[in-house]
């Protein structure tokens, strides 16, 4: 395809050079640029793509999309100037792969907590209903029944559109994806044709990137601002930010809630270690997930399925068959009678939700919590997480969790600042995460609950740029001498 044809996807400020040249590929990473590729110079958080135009030229690129025109323009090159290269990359990526999202019923899920569970359960539900479907998530990507590894919650525009192209070519009718705040802010989802948007909740997270809660909210809201009139916007009415999200959307707005008036409502009747009895839209259903947060997730899945035109009774029947997502309230029972739970909870609110779910299940028995905080991330949440964990646990172990470029001992000390004198008496500081988990299991007795929070599905510990193999679930099973039952 000629460069001239791609220009219709952009709103160029200026075009200098030959637009008749063929474009063989599109690249935003100069290391991946090939002969005849169109190089898009995107300004990132750590570097500026404009700096790598010479390298892209050396590797054979002769067409460039830029925000700033270079002083020197090599002969035979074409420079297309636009106001926003990130936005341009999204449009070009969609066009390069034949606008694949237009051939899918695409639903995006955003929010601080619950994105992975909601997107994954929707994918599983629609597969069980006989549809071919795709999934883009933190844990794994799926093209129908074929899994693909994932590196980001939301991939870059080129990888994302390539993935949707594979889904469309495989005959998928539906696609469900997590939409991170980073992806929205960086316009990775620009030019995608969404048929639905879902908002789960909003609490403190990613302030190391966004700077403030209002900016974090604004990034999430931009997703709904971009929805078309043909789409639905399903929001949590029990979250004060739910209706803020859809203030400026053109989409059809609908709500779900456990407490407030909403289009889709549910009530928890009874809680068990292996599930909950619920009323959902005045219909009784037993579900195999645990916790109020999962009641919201399931209700959200139900509402979205109904908005997509599915039969309500059939949706409820399949909802009762669905089980938890890997690393989300994943339970292991020891031969000694205590229960260990591995969960991805890595924000104060998520930690509170999980511990508040465990407390009534533990009854008079102990709750032992193992938790850390990620390095190079929002430092403000560290003492809050320790404080909230201590309030809800009989024993607390602070440990390492992806320290990245920071010293793990320093992160742990920053967490410990949130502890009172009394809290410190029941707290252990153990830097080695495996030792921390083993210690928690040694302290546990029959009927106790051990929560290992923060990593969930992750299979690595990131230290100074290197991802070392580490899986909380493997360590738990080893501590239980592999005599466990996965619920």
UniProtKB/Swiss-Prot annotation:
<feature type="binding site">
    <location>
        <position position="30"/>
    </location>
    <ligand>
        <name>UDP-N-acetyl-alpha-D-muramoyl-L-alanyl-D-glutamate</name>
    </ligand>
</feature>
<comment type="function">
    <text>Catalyzes the addition of meso-diaminopimelic acid to the nucleotide precursor UDP-N-acetylmuramoyl-L-alanyl-D-glutamate (UMAG) in the biosynthesis of bacterial cell-wall peptidoglycan.</text>
</comment>
<dbReference type="InterPro" id="IPR004101">
    <property type="entry name" value="Mur_ligase_C"/>
</dbReference>
<dbReference type="InterPro" id="IPR036615">
    <property type="entry name" value="Mur_ligase_C_dom_sf"/>
</dbReference>
<keyword id="KW-0131">Cell cycle</keyword>
<keyword id="KW-0963">Cytoplasm</keyword>
<keyword id="KW-0436">Ligase</keyword>
<dbReference type="GO" id="GO:0051301">
    <property type="term" value="P:cell division"/>
</dbReference>
<keyword id="KW-0961">Cell wall biogenesis/degradation</keyword>
<keyword id="KW-0547">Nucleotide-binding</keyword>
<feature type="binding site">
    <location>
        <begin position="153"/>
        <end position="154"/>
    </location>
    <ligand>
        <name>UDP-N-acetyl-alpha-D-muramoyl-L-alanyl-D-glutamate</name>
    </ligand>
</feature>
<feature type="modified residue" description="N6-carboxylysine">
    <location>
        <position position="220"/>
    </location>
</feature>
<feature type="binding site">
    <location>
        <position position="458"/>
    </location>
    <ligand>
        <name>meso-2,6-diaminopimelate</name>
    </ligand>
</feature>
<comment type="similarity">
    <text>Belongs to the MurCDEF family. MurE subfamily.</text>
</comment>
<dbReference type="GO" id="GO:0005524">
    <property type="term" value="F:ATP binding"/>
</dbReference>
<keyword id="KW-0573">Peptidoglycan synthesis</keyword>
<dbReference type="GO" id="GO:0009252">
    <property type="term" value="P:peptidoglycan biosynthetic process"/>
</dbReference>
<dbReference type="GO" id="GO:0008360">
    <property type="term" value="P:regulation of cell shape"/>
</dbReference>
<feature type="binding site">
    <location>
        <position position="180"/>
    </location>
    <ligand>
        <name>UDP-N-acetyl-alpha-D-muramoyl-L-alanyl-D-glutamate</name>
    </ligand>
</feature>
<keyword id="KW-0460">Magnesium</keyword>
<dbReference type="InterPro" id="IPR000713">
    <property type="entry name" value="Mur_ligase_N"/>
</dbReference>
<feature type="short sequence motif" description="Meso-diaminopimelate recognition motif">
    <location>
        <begin position="401"/>
        <end position="404"/>
    </location>
</feature>
<protein>
    <recommendedName>
        <fullName>UDP-N-acetylmuramoyl-L-alanyl-D-glutamate--2,6-diaminopimelate ligase</fullName>
        <ecNumber>6.3.2.13</ecNumber>
    </recommendedName>
</protein>
<dbReference type="Pfam" id="PF08245">
    <property type="entry name" value="Mur_ligase_M"/>
</dbReference>
<keyword id="KW-0133">Cell shape</keyword>
<dbReference type="InterPro" id="IPR013221">
    <property type="entry name" value="Mur_ligase_cen"/>
</dbReference>
<dbReference type="GO" id="GO:0005737">
    <property type="term" value="C:cytoplasm"/>
</dbReference>
<keyword id="KW-0067">ATP-binding</keyword>
<feature type="binding site">
    <location>
        <position position="377"/>
    </location>
    <ligand>
        <name>meso-2,6-diaminopimelate</name>
    </ligand>
</feature>
<feature type="binding site">
    <location>
        <begin position="111"/>
        <end position="117"/>
    </location>
    <ligand>
        <name>ATP</name>
    </ligand>
</feature>
<feature type="binding site">
    <location>
        <position position="186"/>
    </location>
    <ligand>
        <name>UDP-N-acetyl-alpha-D-muramoyl-L-alanyl-D-glutamate</name>
    </ligand>
</feature>
<comment type="pathway">
    <text>Cell wall biogenesis; peptidoglycan biosynthesis.</text>
</comment>
<dbReference type="GO" id="GO:0071555">
    <property type="term" value="P:cell wall organization"/>
</dbReference>
<keyword id="KW-0132">Cell division</keyword>
<dbReference type="InterPro" id="IPR036565">
    <property type="entry name" value="Mur-like_cat_sf"/>
</dbReference>
<dbReference type="GO" id="GO:0008765">
    <property type="term" value="F:UDP-N-acetylmuramoylalanyl-D-glutamate-2,6-diaminopimelate ligase activity"/>
</dbReference>
<dbReference type="Pfam" id="PF02875">
    <property type="entry name" value="Mur_ligase_C"/>
</dbReference>
<dbReference type="InterPro" id="IPR005761">
    <property type="entry name" value="UDP-N-AcMur-Glu-dNH2Pim_ligase"/>
</dbReference>
<dbReference type="InterPro" id="IPR035911">
    <property type="entry name" value="MurE/MurF_N"/>
</dbReference>
<dbReference type="Pfam" id="PF01225">
    <property type="entry name" value="Mur_ligase"/>
</dbReference>
<feature type="binding site">
    <location>
        <position position="454"/>
    </location>
    <ligand>
        <name>meso-2,6-diaminopimelate</name>
    </ligand>
</feature>
<feature type="binding site">
    <location>
        <position position="188"/>
    </location>
    <ligand>
        <name>UDP-N-acetyl-alpha-D-muramoyl-L-alanyl-D-glutamate</name>
    </ligand>
</feature>
